[in-house]
Amino acid sequence: MYYAKKGVLLNPRKGIYTKPKYNEQELACTLLSPSYISLEYVLARAGVTFQYSSEITCISYQNRTIEVDGQAYVFRKINPMIWANMLGIEQRDNIAIATPERAFLDMVYLSAGQCYFDNLHPLNKDLVRQILPTYNSKILTKRVEALLKE
């Protein structure tokens, strides 16, 4: 494309063009679509985990890491029946982002319970329990209930 060759637009991935100053969250949801921002990215900003990560972590239909301008976008695959359910996912300004409660459930689901959370107090436990049936997993339910009791 003419504007990409001239440097007016960036071409981070085939078929995707952005202005030089772009919203990284919006780009994350565009790079691999459909997807939504979740996991460590959301949990760190909510104060549930204290580990810093510069990666923008997303849920999608496949595992992939894409780097654009030094920013890593990490996509984790999850069952399509789960990511297709929009419960606990906020949609605004071309950005789909999980609530901290949904990100917590995504993390426990994908890590098979092998994850650590620094502070579960920011989570709305009623909302966690409301979203939990989306995953249709008795094992996940047991793990989540054990974590919420701690």
Predicted regions, residues:
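Hydrophobic alpha-helical interaction segments
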Residues: 86-150
